[in-house]
Amino acid sequence: MTKRTLGGTSRKRKRVSGFRVRMRSHTGRRVIRTRRKRGRARLAV
């Protein structure tokens, strides 16, 4: 019997929550701004 792994797909992750996707919308830009303010090392996936 094969195991189901819970590894996500990188392309899908990028398309949903990547930096360029975030920059497209007003709320996405707000997310980036908040994460910059908090000093996050990773702003987006």
Swiss-Prot record:
GO terms for biological process: translation. GO terms for cellular component: ribonucleoprotein complex; ribosome. GO terms for molecular function: structural constituent of ribosome. InterPro entries: Ribosomal_bL34, Ribosomal_bL34_CS. Transmembrane segments: none annotated. Signal peptide: none annotated. Residues 1-27 are annotated as: Disordered. It holds the Pfam family Ribosomal_L34. Keywords: Ribonucleoprotein, Ribosomal protein. Gene3D superfamilies: 1.10.287.3980. Residues 10-27 have a biased composition (Basic residues). Belongs to the bacterial ribosomal protein bL34 family. This is Large ribosomal subunit protein bL34. It comes from Synechococcus sp. (strain RCC307). The lineage of its organism: Bacteria, Bacillati, Cyanobacteriota, Cyanophyceae, Synechococcales.
